[in-house]
Amino acid sequence: QRAGGPGAYRDAEVLAAMRAAARLKLPLNLVSILPATENMPGGRAMKPGDVVTTLSGKTVEVQNTDAEGRLILSDGLAYAGRYKPAVLIDIATLTGACVVALGQFAIGMFGTDETLKESVRKAGVRAGERVWEMPLWDEYFEQLKSDVADMRNIGGRGGGMITAALFLSKFAGDWPWVHLDIASTDWSERERAYIPKGPTGIGTRLLIQYLIDRTL
């Protein structure tokens, strides 16, 4: 999960889903990882052109300091691998490109495992939080190649949501993995029958439904 900026109060889906799973007493072994840091300027802050070494050992050339969410998520994904998870799901208000591509009504989904993706898709339909799968093709990684590190933290102008997901995929290991980009859906400009105007909590219902489905 990644949250940031003045609207960070709207980003607590993983925490909410874990709380619900505990209250429902779901017979599952769950691990929730919430990488957190304070994003602010300072004498030791990241600068464009810096090269950082991630928890996984991979190096990243920082091309844009505003693409910081994927940096902390990369360490969260690498850390999650220590638990040898049956499945790995991350959720983040990650990219403005998601807003442009999908608008307010679809969660962007990427993944490496067909069974997991289909389970998440079905859970989204049941929960009223629909996902739309986007490609995770290797050709897009050309935009992330770096001369001084294993990869850059941002690509070019095109396909920003895809290159962000591809970046994360390099830290997800070989575990069945799904990434949900909720940047376009975490806020509603109007009241709906099931959501008040404002923060939507999008992804919480989907995650809970997915967890319930795993117990059936």
Descriptions of predicted regions:
Residues 1-216:
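A generic structural signal for tightly packed, nonpolar segments enriched in small/aliphatic residues
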